[in-house]
């Protein structure tokens, strides 16, 4: 501002129009004019004349020497600042607003007059900054004895006082406080108010409103370069002239101006009417208006401050929460590289990363312990409290409806609740708070929405890809072009036959009958072609009699080289030829094929899936296209999918109920029946059932209850039978699951003859006699078959569909009366004292060993004899094999020769199963040949051999020797069976040699009668057979 002062004070002629912001109007104005225009504009021209822009004042209050009537003009708009223009005037609309606030203490301290007045000082400090001073104050200011000096700057600018060229009556003057009381500029030079028109000064209080501008700025730019010498002497007297608009005269006219001011003050004393001219109402109205403006501005600034504060709080909380989550979940991988891919891939990777991070012990334990713990660190508690306080403060600032208490609540009830509340409450974990549940629900909704959006976008991408593939396949298809059809042969034959007709009338009829079908066919084809061409897009051309609307589009899409271009040209020519259909147009199958491009056969089932992900089977039960390439399922799996127990709960529930989505379903969407079903199923499966086996007597009674239930009418029997079948089947299923007979029962036929009769009785109606015969014929095999297991109706399982659709009829057989329940005395069922003294069967192990000792001895003798037979040469003429047995032929010379009984074939099975060589025969030992056998003994031998197949060795008849029983053995055996067999073999070899010498002296026929010893089993096989025999149980 100081730099602009010399430019404004150089030439008086350059400043044509100067606009100043003036104080509110004084008491001389009417209230209406004050309300309409509180601030007036004074225009000061270069020639020193003054033009007022306000309404005319009362002439009685005009104290000027030569009052001139001025024209009334329109009220100028409110101007908040002044503008300096060099050539032209500046409009009031383009004026700049320059507002400031005076420091009241600075004003009071800088001016000696104002500092002495206590009332003015209190008024300035308590209300708007308005200065009021009387003429005595001005006279004191004028007679201070100070020299005339340049005036202090107005609104921060030092103005050079303009000099009048004519020194007329209308000398340089200015208006103070809106032109209501005028003070000459010359009087202001010496610190006085006056001038040539000093008589114009109005008596009364002068209203001077200080602008809202700091006085420090004005002190920095007090004077221009011409008045820097004496600025300290007039500082105290220049303040009243700061608010008014005045012209500053140069320092050369200061003495004359001071004289004029003194004369004017002496002529017109105004002390008598000091307080009479004040208009308090106007002043109060202006002050209230200004106060309202200040309040509006303060409210606007407060709103802006609240917005900035709320943003700062939000940024601070986001930063703190982000740092907390980043610290807690610091092990999550970086997903920035996946943002360029599809949203579905990003979502899946994020879910996998979250699951992996949650599965880790450190992260999961730290986060879960933090959320479930009853105590939180002080730092988090402090941050939570401060954040809540800041958020509540911001919310209350923005929302005026937020109050501390409810509007409808009563104060006494609230006080009771406050007194009843416990101030020392324990800390509530975060998971139990309502804010946590709300945040969890919101996060669940957001995650499901993001998942759905990702899948929808992925599905749209796949649909577009499938459409592009379909268009590409259609574009790559070649067109089959057919040649021109030859003239039909049957038409030629018919025409030749028509020429042989003698009469013209008959020839005409024949020609018409022959040519009419071909002409009609040609017309029909042409009509079809026209109709198809009008319906098709663009200008398609018929190919093979059918218009292909895709042909012009596909021709542009198929890229090709020069050969393809020539091929397209030939195709167009051929199509033009074909399009001209005439009466000879025939079916396409009779026309020759010119070109046929091999088309690729695309099977959707054999297409490789578009994505590399593993396709899962469709979980829902809706109909799905099995050959869809995008689904990736080659065939719809009709079998129920296997439940993966490691999968999440919703995914497992979705396999049980198609209404539950594995991802989008909420836990509340799962029906309660599924939870109850899992509970009931686990209870039925895991509960151990104590199976009580009924006795045979009760089972027979239970078996006879079915015919009794059929004695009622048909309608009642139907319901009873179906209900009994279902209930008994369910109970039997649960009770027999763990029984061993359950496995054996599955191998029996599913339907018994009785059930077949029930199922077929509704289809065929048989007479009474035939029904009774069928019942009798079916009951007999049942009685025969059920030797051990009696027939039980609980074993019958009838499906629900069969039971619901089958019409149950009464069976045609004799009803068996069964007794009803009766009371039985328990004491009578107990046995008599005589029965208690009866001998009880001994079932101990010692008793069983004693009973089976005889069989064990026979078994031991058989095996020892078998291993002691000496080896014989096979192929001897004295032995021959017939029927698988080694039987010696009977000799006629010696009919009493003993005939040893050959062992049964079945008796050698046990030995052949464990021996590696050929199964040995078991004839009687040679030392027993001489013992004669009577027919009775022979019969007894055969009877014993056939009765017990395990022991094929016959008893020794009358010469039987008593054998001591074996002593009790402990396995493994202490002795070696191989050594014992070798010792017995040496003894048997000696006896065998003696037998051969005796038999060698006999005739050839007698020699043939002699039995042949079987080949000796190797020692290894003997040892194995003996070991196996020893390990077999002693009793059957």
Curated annotation (Swiss-Prot):
Main function: Non-catalytic component of the NSL histone acetyltransferase complex, a multiprotein complex that mediates histone H4 acetylation at 'Lys-5'- and 'Lys-8' (H4K5ac and H4K8ac) at transcription start sites and promotes transcription initiation. The NSL complex also acts as a regulator of gene expression in mitochondria. In addition to its role in transcription, KANSL1 also plays an essential role in spindle assembly during mitosis. Associates with microtubule ends and contributes to microtubule stability.
UniProt organism field: Mus musculus (Mouse)
Coiled-coil boundaries: 285-312
Modified residues (N6-acetyllysine): 104
Chain intervals with Polar residues compositional bias: 226-244, 886-896
Localisation per UniProt entry: Nucleus; Chromosome, Centromere, Kinetochore; Mitochondrion; Cytoplasm, Cytoskeleton, Spindle pole
Gene: Kansl1
PANTHER family, sorted: KAT8 REGULATORY NSL COMPLEX SUBUNIT 1, NON-SPECIFIC LETHAL 1, ISOFORM M
Single GO cellular component term: mitochondrion
Positions with biased composition (Low complexity): 245-256, 759-772, 906-919
Modified residues (Phosphoserine): 249, 268, 922, 925, 976
Assembly notes: Component of the NSL complex at least composed of MOF/KAT8, KANSL1, KANSL2, KANSL3, MCRS1, PHF20, OGT1/OGT, WDR5 and HCFC1. Interacts (via PEHE domain) with KAT8 (via HAT domain); the interaction is direct. Component of some MLL1/MLL complex, at least composed of the core components KMT2A/MLL1, ASH2L, HCFC1, WDR5 and RBBP5, as well as the facultative components BACC1, CHD8, E2F6, HSP70, INO80C, KANSL1, LAS1L, MAX, MCRS1, MGA, KAT8/MOF, PELP1, PHF20, PRP31, RING2, RUVB1/TIP49A, RUVB2/TIP49B, SENP3, TAF1, TAF4, TAF6, TAF7, TAF9 and TEX10.
PROSITE patterns to which the protein is assigned, alphabetical: PEHE
Stated name of the protein: KAT8 regulatory NSL complex subunit 1
Glycyl lysine isopeptide (Lys-Gly) (interchain with G-Cter in SUMO2) cross-link site: 262, 331
């Amino acid at each position: 501002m100081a730099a602009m002062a010399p430019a404004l004070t150089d030439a008086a002629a350059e400043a044509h129009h100067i606009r100043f912001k003036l104080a509110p109007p004084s008491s001389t104005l009417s209230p209406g004019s004050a309300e309409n225009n509180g601030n007036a504009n004074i225009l000061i021209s270069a020639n020193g004349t003054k033009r007022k822009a306000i309404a005319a004042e009362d002439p009685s209050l005009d104290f000027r020497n030569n009052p001139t009537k001025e024209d009334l003009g329109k009220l100028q708009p409110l101007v908040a600042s002044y503008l300096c223009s060099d050539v032209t005037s500046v409009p009031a609309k383009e004026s700049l607003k320059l507002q400031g606030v005076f420091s009241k203490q600075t004003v009071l301290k800088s001016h000696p007059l104002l500092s002495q007045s206590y009332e003015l000082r209190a008024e300035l400090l308590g209300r708007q900054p308005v200065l009021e001073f009387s003429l005595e104050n001005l006279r004191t200011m004028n007679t201070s004895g100070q020299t005339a000096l340049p005036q202090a700057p107005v609104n921060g600018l030092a103005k050079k006082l303009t000099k009048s060229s004519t020194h007329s009556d209308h000398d340089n003057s200015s208006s103070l406080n809106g032109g209501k009381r005028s003070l000459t500029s010359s009087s202001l030079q010496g610190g006085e108010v006056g001038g040539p028109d000093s008589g114009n000064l109005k008596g009364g209080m002068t209203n001077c409103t200080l602008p809202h501008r700091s006085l420090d700025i004005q002190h920095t730019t007090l004077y221009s370069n011409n008045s820097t010498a004496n600025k300290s002497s007039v500082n105290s007297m220049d303040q009243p002239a700061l608010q008014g608009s005045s012209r500053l005269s140069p320092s050369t006219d200061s003495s004359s101006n001071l004289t004029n001011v003194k004369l004017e003050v002496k002529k017109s004393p105004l002390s008598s009417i000091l307080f009479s001219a004040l208009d308090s109402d106007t002043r109060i109205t202006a002050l209230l208006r200004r106060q309202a403006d200040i309040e509006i501005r303060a409210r606007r600034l407060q709103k802006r401050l609240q917005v900035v504060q709320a943003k700062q709080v939000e940024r601070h909380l986001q930063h703190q929460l982000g740092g907390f989550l980043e610290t807690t979940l610091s092990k999550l991988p970086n997903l920035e590289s996946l943002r360029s891919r599809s949203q579905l891939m990003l979502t899946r990777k994020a879910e996998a990363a979250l699951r992996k991070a949650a599965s880790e012990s450190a992260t999961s334990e730290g986060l879960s312990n933090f959320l479930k713990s009853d105590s939180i660190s002080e730092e988090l508690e402090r941050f939570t409290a401060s954040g809540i306080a800041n958020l509540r403060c911001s919310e209350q600032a923005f929302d005026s409806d937020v109050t501390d208490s409810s509007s409808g609540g009563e104060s006494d009830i609230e006080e009771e609740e406050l007194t009843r509340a416990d101030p020392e409450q324990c800390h509530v974990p975060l998971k139990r708070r309502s804010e946590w549940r709300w945040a969890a629900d919101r996060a669940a909704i957001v995650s499901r929405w993001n998942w759905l959006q990702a899948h929808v976008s992925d599905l749209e991408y796949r649909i577009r890809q499938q459409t592009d593939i379909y268009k590409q396949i259609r574009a790559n298809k070649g067109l089959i072009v057919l040649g021109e059809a030859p003239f039909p042969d049957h038409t030629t034959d018919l025409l030749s036959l028509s020429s042989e007709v003698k009469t013209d009338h008959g020839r005409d009829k024949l020609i018409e009958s022959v040519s009419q079908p071909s002409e009609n066919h040609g017309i029909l084809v042409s009509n079809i072609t026209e109709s198809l061409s009008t319906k098709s897009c663009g200008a398609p051309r018929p190919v093979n009699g059918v218009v292909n609307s895709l042909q012009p589009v596909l021709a542009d899409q198929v890229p090709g080289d020069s050969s393809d271009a020539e091929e397209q040209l030939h195709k167009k020519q051929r199509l033009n030829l074909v399009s001209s259909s005439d009466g000879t147009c025939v079916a396409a199958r009779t026309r020759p094929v010119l070109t046929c491009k091999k088309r690729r056969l695309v099977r959707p089932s054999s297409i490789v899936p578009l994505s590399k992900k593993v396709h899962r089977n469709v979980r829902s039960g809706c109909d799905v296209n099995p050959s869809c390439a995008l689904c990736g399922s080659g065939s719809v799996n009709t079998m129920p999918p296997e439940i993966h127990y490691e999968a999440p709960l919703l995914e497992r529930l979705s396999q049980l109920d198609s209404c539950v989505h594995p991802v989008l379903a909420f836990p509340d969407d799962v029906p309660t029946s599924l939870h109850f079903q899992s509970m009931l199923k686990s209870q039925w499966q895991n509960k151990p059932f104590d199976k009580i086996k009924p006795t045979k007597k009760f089972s027979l009674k239970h078996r006879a209850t079915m015919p009794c239930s059929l004695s009622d009418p048909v309608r009642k029997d139907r319901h009873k039978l179906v209900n009994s079948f279902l209930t008994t089947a369910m109970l039997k299923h649960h009770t027999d699951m763990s029984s061993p007979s359950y496995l054996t029962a599955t191998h029996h036929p599913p339907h018994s003859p009785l059930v077949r009769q029930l199922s077929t009785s509704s289809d065929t109606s048989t007479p009474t006699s035939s029904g009774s015969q069928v019942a009798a014929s079916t009951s007999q095999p049942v009685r025969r078959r059920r030797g051990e297991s009696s027939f039980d109706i609980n074993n019958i399982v009838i499906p629900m569909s069969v039971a619901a659709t089958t019409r149950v009829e009464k069976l045609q057989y004799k009803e068996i009366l069964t007794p009803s329940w009766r009371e039985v005395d328990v004491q009578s069922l107990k046995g008599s004292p005589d029965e208690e003294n009866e001998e009880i069967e001994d079932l101990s192990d010692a008793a069983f060993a004693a009973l089976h000792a005889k069989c064990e001895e026979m078994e031991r003798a058989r095996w020892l004899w078998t291993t002691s037979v000496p080896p014989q040469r096979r192929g001897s003429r004295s032995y021959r094999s017939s029927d698988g047995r080694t039987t010696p032929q009977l000799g006629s010379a010696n009919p009493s020769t003993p005939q040893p009984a050959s062992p049964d074939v079945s008796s050698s099975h046990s030995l052949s199963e464990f021996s590696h060589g050929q199964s040995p025969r078991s004839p009687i030992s040679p030392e027993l040949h001489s013992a004669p056998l009577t027919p009775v003994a022979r019969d007894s031998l055969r009877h014993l051999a056939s009765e017990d197949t395990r022991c094929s060795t016959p008893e020794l008849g009358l010469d039987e020797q008593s054998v001591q029983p074996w002593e009790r053995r402990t396995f493994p055996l202490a002795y070696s069976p191989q050594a014992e067999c070798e010792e017995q073999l040496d003894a048997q070899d000696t006896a065998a040699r003696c037998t051969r010498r005796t038999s060698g002296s006999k005739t050839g026929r007698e020699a043939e009668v002699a039995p042949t010893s079987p080949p000796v089993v190797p020692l290894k096989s003997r040892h194995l057979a003996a070991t196996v025999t020893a390990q077999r149980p002693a009793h059957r």
